[in-house]
């Protein structure tokens, strides 16, 4: 098999679908058969192909993500259209040309838009009412109750239920319980006061990933969460929206040592990547140490500590501080683990007009696929001379 540590002479990513499939199977085993899984594409769009047969739904949060799914031939009936800024043109295009999608309602404006478009095109649209978590997302309980109370005015809408998501990296079972209890009470109130039995709840769990060696009892957390679902008085179809928890472990980021130096007693490695290409959630000025390996020298003992900086002309472009490494040379390759979620897309990609890293995929059969070549960004930052 190809040595994935030597695929490119510049920084690059590798996402392994085999690891991805094992991760989904592991989560399903812990969660049981009660819940379906929706993958949030924003975590990593390069994984859509690897997950299309592994999850029940794909969560789309932008027109660009919709285009990605269309280019891959994803069945529209598998998609949920979410996001706070659903432009009329984007939603009308979807309503006019496709059937079977689910649309989230993030505001009363979106609600009226969906109702109007459904009537215009003679379609019955599936909608999920998103409950706010006291942020810019979703609508209040009072708005949800008003919509449900007056639902007969909107026969063109199929009210599928509620959606809720409050954030990522949740390590507290107590917090998850508080949210589910609140949702349980609202779902029961809708039934008791308005005669509406919600068919479905879509819930974003925000399960955490241990990027920096944290003591995370994941199995206990997820099995405890499963018990909370089973204790809900409302009983209906549950879909769990997952992104980071599914994707993180399948990814590795490879970057090369471009230079090395010692300044006033501190060792520095300059890498051909940096924070414009790779960033961990919770990483701040390299203060936390993710799992990193010096490729080909994993079995050697550390000989010194090194500060790992990227290629940007910025004091902030530090990936790791005081990382113990074996003897390291210019040209060596470093591998950053658990980079499958968000790392590839959250960096400041256009800063200093540096390159976008290549992306490789390993499919379920072990075949290596070049999903994106190294791309220069300077054309995007070059002023257009048109008048």
Model-identified regions with their sequence ranges:
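Conserved beta-strand positions
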Residues: 60, 81, 105, 129, ...
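A charged N-terminal "starter" segment
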Residues: 1-105, 111-125, 154, 158, ...
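Active-site loop/helix belt of alpha/beta enzymes
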Residues: 117, 133-264, 351-354
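Conserved, mostly hydrophobic/aromatic
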Residues: 20, 42, 62, 94, ...
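Electropositive phosphate-/nucleotide-binding environments in soluble metabolic enzymes
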Residues: 14-21, 45, 60-63, 88, ...
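ATP-grasp fold ATP-binding core
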Residues: 126-132
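Charged (often Lys/Glu-rich) extended helix/loop segments that serve as interaction or gating elements
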Residues: 237-387
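Flexible loop/turn segments at secondary-structure boundaries
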Residues: 45-47, 67, 168-172, 207-211, ...
């Amino acid at each position: 098999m190809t040595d994935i540590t030597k695929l490119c002479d510049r920084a690059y990513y590798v996402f392994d679908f085999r690891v991805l499939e094992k991760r989904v199977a592991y989560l399903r085993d812990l969660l049981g058969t009660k819940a379906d899984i929706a993958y949030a594409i924003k975590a990593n769009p390069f994984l859509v192909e690897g997950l299309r047969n592994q999850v029940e739904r794909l969560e789309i949060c932008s027109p660009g993500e919709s285009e990605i799914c269309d280019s891959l031939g994803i069945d529209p009936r598998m998609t949920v259209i979410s996001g706070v800024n659903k432009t009329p043109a984007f939603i009308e295009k979807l309503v006019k040309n496709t059937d079977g999608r689910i649309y989230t309602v993030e505001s009363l404006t979106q609600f009226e838009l969906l109702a109007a478009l459904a009537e215009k095109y003679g379609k019955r649209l599936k909608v999920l009412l998103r409950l706010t978590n006291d942020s810019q997302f979703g609508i209040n309980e009072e708005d949800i109750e008003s919509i449900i109370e007056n639902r007969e005015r909107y026969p063109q809408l199929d009210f599928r239920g509620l959606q809720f998501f409050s954030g990522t990296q949740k390590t507290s079972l107590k917090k998850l319980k508080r949210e589910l209890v609140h949702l349980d009470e609202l779902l029961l109130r809708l039934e008791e006061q308005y005669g509406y039995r919600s068919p479905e709840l879509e819930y974003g769990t925000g399960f955490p990933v241990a990027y920096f060696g944290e003591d995370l009892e994941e199995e206990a957390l997820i099995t405890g969460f499963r018990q909370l679902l089973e204790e809900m008085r409302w009983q209906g179809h549950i879909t769990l929206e997952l992104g980071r928890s599914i994707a993180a472990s399948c990814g590795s980021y490879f970057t090369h040592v471009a230079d090395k130096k010692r300044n006033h007693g501190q060792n520095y490695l300059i890498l051909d990547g940096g924070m414009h290409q790779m960033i961990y959630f919770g990483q701040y000025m390299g203060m936390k140490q993710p799992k990193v390996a010096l490729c080909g020298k994993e079995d050697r003992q550390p000989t010194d500590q090194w500060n790992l900086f990227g290629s940007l002309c910025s004091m902030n472009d530090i990936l790791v501080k005081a990382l113990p490494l074996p003897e390291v040379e210019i040209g060596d390759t470093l591998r950053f683990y658990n980079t499958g979620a968000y790392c590839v897309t959250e960096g400041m990609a256009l800063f200093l007009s540096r390159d976008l890293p290549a992306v490789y995929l390993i499919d379920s059969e072990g075949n290596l696929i070049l999903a994106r070549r190294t791309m220069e960004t300077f054309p995007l930052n070059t002023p257009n001379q048109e008048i």
